[in-house]
Amino acid sequence: MLAGQAPPGAAGCGRLLAAALRPLLCGLSPCWVAGRQCRGLRVAEAATEEAQVVQREKRGGVPVRRYIACPRLARTVQQCLQRGAGPQPLLLEFAPGPGILTQTLLNAGIRVVALESNLAYLPNLQSLENSLDGQLKVIYGDFCRLDPLVTGTLKPPAVCSEKLFETMGVAAVPWRADVPLRIFGIMPHTLERNRLWRLLFGLYECNSIYKYGRVELNLFISEKEYMVLRAKPGETWAYQPLTVLAQIGCEIELLHKVSVLYQLIWPNAMDWLPNDHLCLVRLTPQQNLFTGGLKPTNATTFIFMVKQCLAKPTSRLTLEIPENAAMRDLYPEDYRRLFEALQNSSTFTETWFYDEVLETVRTINL
């Protein structure tokens, strides 16, 4: 659905909700350190290489990406990612850049797959890979172009999840099993909301990375998007469909927060950066997500229902519900209970969702 536009059938949706809701709802500052030596990584040389890459990107008009440039921050992130002292699941790090965090993870004994789309960084990463005995695997690819919605042969750095997981040696496990893979990365500022939506669609439909189980995401995202993910009912601007779906689908944990993550930026970078905070957030899919009436086969319908309900978040609800209750006042679990009630009802069918909307909902806002 396009932002600011009510989806078709909103009036019918309101009548449907009124009938269905009656029985349901009564009741530190990172720094760039050059010259500090780490085993297997020449930080000063990495800094020089990073500066050269940034200059090439500036000349070519390509947006400069953000990387972890501070060894102290890298150690903090490593501690956030490492749970306990026992064996750790494989970790996929996308867009590692100069590899400062990569080296820190390796030093901690974590097995890492580095997925890098910038050819300028591959030689250093591959050199590090060759110096180790299988602890690091380097793959050319772009996580943000994983399983693109196109037909035909993919052109690198676009990558297919099936090929990626085969290369990593990660097999599919049952949904309620332990986490088979952890992923870390910094979400690009451009199209950040769209990328989060794509991940949520994959989660609910058990597609892409989620075909292999409850893959854990550890992402640096903007503080604005984190506030949306953790919003509470009634919060005017923050409580959105993304909020409801993320809170139902995932356990959301704030691991760390930094004021500035990327130091080598354009002179006018502050003109387009939305704020100066990034939040490291862990998104772990819920084990009990697909219990009751919610299943991967009807999850798209559920997503659209939530978007439909919150298209006009101030719409009033009636019928044995408090007078001032509005769509944005319902808790995420209320939406799930409503959907499950509709699924179990012989009165309502999915025809009111409109076939054309179901066909396009995967790509709108993605």
Question: Which stretches of residues belong to each language-model region?
Answer:
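Catalytic cores of RNA-modifying enzymes
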Residues: L2-F304, R337-Y354, E359-L366
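Short, flexible active-site loop motifs that bind/organize anionic cofactors or intermediates
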Residues: E216, K307, A325
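RNA substrate-recognition surfaces in RNA-acting enzymes
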Residues: T318-E340
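Long, well-ordered amphipathic alpha-helical subdomains in the mid-to-C-terminal portions
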Residues: T297-P322
